[in-house]
Amino acid sequence: MFNAVKADMPDDPMLARRYGQCLELALEACQDTPEQFKLVETPLKSFLLVSNILPQDNRPWHEARSSGRVAEDDYDFSSLALELLPLNPRLPEEWQFGGQGWSSRMEPSQPEMGMGLCFEVFDGDLMRIALAWNKDEVIGQALQILAHSQTWTSLVPEDPLPWMWALFYGPRSHCEERHCVYAAARGKRGPILLPTAVYTPCANIEAFLAHLTRCVYALYLDVRDWKGEDIAPPFDVSRLNKMAKQLCLLPQEPFCITRVCLLCLLHKQNLNAQYKRPVDTYDPCLILTGEAERYMVDAVGNYREASTGTTVLYPTYDLGSIVADMVTYEDE
């Protein structure tokens, strides 16, 4: 056989030795399994190892069956003795042989799903609304839509203004973090982060009202008399007391709302990624999209769901740039 390596690269002993080893291995494979591998010398000074992916499997009983000489009943397996395990009486009847047994019918258990992460997506407009203390534009849009009678079907809040004021400007509408990033940057604690549906009443007024009532319920359920609160609403306090009575009419559904601002959540998300700390599943994982993607940095955090084994990646952001841009849209 012609040695192509020696002809092309005679001064490379390492390549020549590797060539010889590969060729020797190919010859051994062809000799051991001639029906699966064939070594072909090409006119281009090289060798081609051809493999048959589906080799012929000729077994004696296959030939006998194909020719019709031996039937399946001719094979005698009476000498085989396999020990059988006792039947589990706790299995459901339909799972037991013959349908006999005293067990009651059981439903197959559903696979347990992990809690996972709660993702919240914010574009540039939503991020500006979430960071701004002035929510008059959102309240004005909601009141304009609610001025029409067709939007008041089976709704609990007969007077929506106290509900919106309590959520956006109430005594429990500011961040409760010990070291608030918003307070360090702007001199006062930031507004708590709310579901995105609360910031866009024009998109779906029913979703806005549903989240509005649930958030107010979670924040102010224990407040019975608003006259004792140190507040100054732009309307009579009796409207807030009426709202407190209507809170008891809402269904007691579990609803969790974290009294944390957007900057503190982003800061916590950055720290989790930097120090590989476990992610708190009660805090949402924030994803900034649209024009807000420019705040994203190269560092990426990861979260592994223990029950499912899946790994989730989440981004980190430049808080300095976000705070610097807040000057243009956050009212003093």
Curated annotation (Swiss-Prot):
Changing residue 42 to A: Drastic decrease of expression of vPIC-dependent late genes and loss of production of new virus particles. No effect on early gene expression, viral DNA replication, or expression of vPIC-independent late genes. The keyword Cytoplasm does not apply. The modification Phosphothreonine is found at residue 42. The keyword Phosphoprotein applies. Phosphorylation on threonine is necessary for the formation of the trimeric complex, for the expression of vPIC-dependent late genes and production of new virus particles. Keywords: Phosphoprotein. Transmembrane segments: none annotated. Part of a trimeric complex composed of BGLF3, BFRF2 and BVLF1. Part of the viral pre-initiation complex (vPIC) that is responsible for the expression of vPIC-dependent late genes. vPIC is composed of at least BcRF1 that binds the viral TATT box, BDLF3.5, BDLF4, BFRF2, BGLF3, BGLF4 and BVLF1. Belongs to the herpesviridae UL95 family. This is Late gene expression regulator BGLF3. It comes from Epstein-Barr virus (strain B95-8).
